[in-house]
Design a protein with these regions (language model features):
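Domain-scale signature associated with acetyltransferase and cell-envelope carbohydrate enzymes
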Residues: 1-185
Length: 187
């Protein structure tokens, strides 16, 4: 009996186009994933990663799973993005965005250029403008946060922060605006 992992042919196609896959037999790639949407230029997919979704895109220089397994489901991953470990569903990561080990990024999130978080960060329906930095052990949902103009001039949320948007009676949730968004960050 010959054992082959699901998506074995797709893994072979990735390797053939130049993707670095240190341990090919540990990857799980869904049948719906379009290999043409995964760049072969300087992309590394480390052991234990799972890639699902017909809308998944992985651009050049992306690094997936360096610190632990990554599950991606219908995400758009821009150039030089580092998703070091965790679960990522229906989210967008622009150039240089990054998330540490044990991240949980759910639907509706956008991490713009060089925005990112350390380990154990949970996001849902959150937009981080360029250069926003999130510390470790954070739950940061339903937020729009302005970032800054560079890595030196940026916005940061410290570690062990929880942001829930419920009224005291628990009957309603509302989004939060953090930073100087109304005065021109969106322009």
């Amino acid at each position: 009996m010959e054992l082959k992992p699901r998506g074995y042919e797709k893994v072979q196609q990735l390797i053939h186009k130049g993707v670095s896959v240190p341990n090919p037999l540990t990857l799980d790639i869904g049948e719906e994933v379009d290999i043409e949407r995964v760049s072969g230029d300087r992309v590394t997919i480390y052991p234990g990663c799972r890639i699902y979704g017909a809308n998944t895109v992985v651009a050049s220089g992306a690094q997936l799973g360096y610190e632990g397994p990554v599950t991606i489901d219908n995400c758009q991953i821009g150039p030089k993005v580092e998703l070091k470990g965790g679960y990522f569903k229906e989210a967008v990561f622009l150039e240089g965005a990054n998330m540490g080990l044990a991240a949980h990024v759910r639907e509706g999130c956008i991490l713009e250029e060089q925005a990112g978080g350390a380990h154990c960060v949970g996001l849902k329906q959150t937009i981080l403008f360029p250069f926003v930095t999130l510390g470790s052990l954070i739950n940061f949902c339903d937020c729009l946060m302005a970032g800054g103009t560079s890595r030196k001039n940026h916005s940061e949320v410290g570690s062990s922060y929880i942001h829930f948007n419920f009224t005291p009676s628990g009957d309603k949730t509302t989004p939060s605006l953090i930073g100087d968004v109304p005065r021109g960050v969106m322009l």
